[in-house]
From Swiss-Prot:
It comes from the Eukaryota. GO terms for biological process: mRNA processing; RNA splicing; tRNA processing. Its main location: plastid. It is found in: Plastid, Chloroplast. The keyword RNA-binding applies. This is Maturase K.
Length: 507
């Protein structure tokens, strides 16, 4: 136990940081303003010609320190004695400053650790979020058991502050942070779930940092437990970042003290001969080739870790251990399972002939048609049964703009789901978008679909819904009909996918 505590303390030991003074630096809020999360955050209401003002921040911090009582009435959420005018407006101002300042030491530490480990050299091969699927295809076919885990949340904000104090040594800064969270949260503590959800909407940047930090802390302890429980060395442990912001950080942060501080720590996995761990955002998958009782041991590790260290309630029945051949899991908008392909091989030895049955495991990654139809129905492209409908909101646009919008959505979905082993569901989605586009154009011209197509001859350019993928492939591969036909049937993982599609929702 003493060795474990020494390990964690050594891992968290960092030099003294002086972050408190940065809260009062004007360029910190200039960075937040230029980040364009919300252009109206740091705007004076009158007299400053739409320029952000450091005077607002200093005035609010002074009022926070002068506040005598921190408990504010729950019935006074829009206007109270502490904030004075608008809670959301002032909360966003200070939380943006906190989020930018607190990211600085973590990213500088990350930059040095990546350079020491020389991870940057081979990072380019793993910069897409879809790079996880070749890993699944390569490794999961040899495994037997899988556990689909949702990382429990929310966690109390005070616990996050206490954990942050282990990593960053700056007492005045965390005193101010605790004071801010206590004052902000005091008028909605009667409904805890509403408190966290409201905080995440009003302060998305700061909330994402706290959430990602919580997940990183949990995974660092998880890796430590794995090392203590196994005599085998950890074969690999890598942390990947969504490419959309990574290179901007590498090129500008160290030189310019940061142009962009987004903390998109989202994709991690580690593997060893016994256990495989994959995580994207708040969902992780644990798979193993060994007996299920070893998986059960890890399940109880997780439960006790969340309950005892983070005070997040989680029950064992929420984590199920299933045979991989009988269970499908959802990740990044795909349904994945292991399919058993059985074949009979005739073997002849001298005068004897034997029939040998061979079972080959193959991972099956398909498009989840029902969730996609629900997403399209929510976006008003079809009804809940998948029947295409018109989009009258776009009827004021020109014909070219309407067609271009539908084509972009169709191309993005086709690009995202090109790795599916079954294309029938994808063709149905493209058909829904194609017919919805035609109905929208017919609605704009106050005509029926049949009359509109007959009058305008729109069949030709609407065929792009089914031909744009072949045109892209023809630019990459030789213009051989058999080659393109084979590629259109096979799985293709495009490693330029930076983030999940807007119509993709992981449940």
């Amino acid at each position: 136990m003493k060795e474990s505590q020494v390990y964690l303390e050594r891992a968290r030991s960092r030099q003294q940081h002086f972050l408190y003074s940065l809260i009062f630096r004007e360029y910190i809020y200039g960075l937040a303003y230029s980040h364009n999360l919300n252009r109206s955050l740091f705007v004076e209401n009158v007299g400053y010609d739409n320029k952000y003002s450091l005077l607002i921040v200093k005035r609010l911090i002074t009022r926070m320190y002068q506040q005598n009582h921190l408990i504010i009435s729950a019935n006074d959420s829009n206007k109270n004695s502490f904030w004075g005018y608008n809670n959301n407006y002032y909360s966003q101002i200070i939380s943006e400053g906190f989020s930018i300042v607190v990211e600085i030491p973590f990213f500088l530490q990350l930059s040095s650790s990546l350079e020491e480990a020389e991870i940057i050299k081979y990072y380019k091969n793993f910069r897409s979020i879809h790079s996880i699927f070749p890993f699944l295809e390569d490794k999961f076919t040899y495994l037997n058991y899988v556990s689909d885990i949702r990382i429990p949340y929310p966690i109390h904000l005070e616990i996050l502050v206490q954990i942050l104090r282990y990593w960053v040594k700056d007492a005045p800064f965390f005193h101010l942070l605790r004071l801010f969270l206590c004052n902000w949260n005091s008028f909605i503590t009667t409904k805890k779930k509403k408190s966290i959800s409201t905080f995440s909407k009003i302060n998305p940047r700061f909330f994402l940092f706290l959430y990602n930090f919580y997940v990183c802390e949990y995974e660092s302890i998880f890796v430590f437990l794995r090392n203590q429980s196994s005599h085998l060395p950890l074969k690999s442990f890598r942390v990947f970042f969504e490419r959309i912001f990574f290179y901007a950080k590498r090129e500008h942060l160290v030189k310019l003290f940061a142009k962009d501080f987004l903390y998109t720590l989202t994709l991690t996995f580690f593997k060893d001969p016994n256990i495989h761990y994959v995580r994207y955002q708040g969902k992780c998958i644990l798979a193993s080739k060994n007996a299920p009782f070893l998986m059960d041991k890890w399940k109880h590790y997780f439960i006790h870790l969340w309950q005892c260290f983070f005070d997040v309630w989680s029950q064992p029945r929420t984590i199920n251990i299933n045979p991989l051949s009988e269970h499908s899991f959802k990740l990044l908008g795909y349904f994945s399972n292991v399919r058993l392909n059985r074949s009979v091989v005739r073997s002849q030895m001298l005068q004897n002939t034997f029939l040998i049955e061979i079972v080959i495991k193959k991972i099956d990654i398909i498009v989840p048609i029902l969730p996609l139809i629900r997403s399209l129905a929510k976006a008003k492209f079809c009804n809940v049964l998948g029947q295409p409908i018109s989009k009258p909101v776009w009827a004021d646009s020109s014909d070219f703009d309407i067609i271009d919008r539908f084509l972009r959505i169709s191309r993005n979905l086709s690009h995202y789901y090109k790795g599916s082993s079954k294309k029938k569901s994808l063709y149905r989605i493209k058909y829904i978008l194609r017919l919805s586009c035609i109905k929208t154009l017919a609605c704009k011209h106050k005509s029926t679909v049949r009359a509109f197509l007959k009058r305008s001859g729109s069949e030709e350019f609407l065929q792009e819904f089914f031909t744009e993928e072949e045109e892209i492939l023809s630019l990459i591969f030789p213009r051989d009909s058999s080659t393109l036909e084979r590629l259109s049937r096979n799985r293709i993982w495009y490693l330029d996918i930076l983030f999940s599609n807007d119509l993709v929702h992981d449940e």
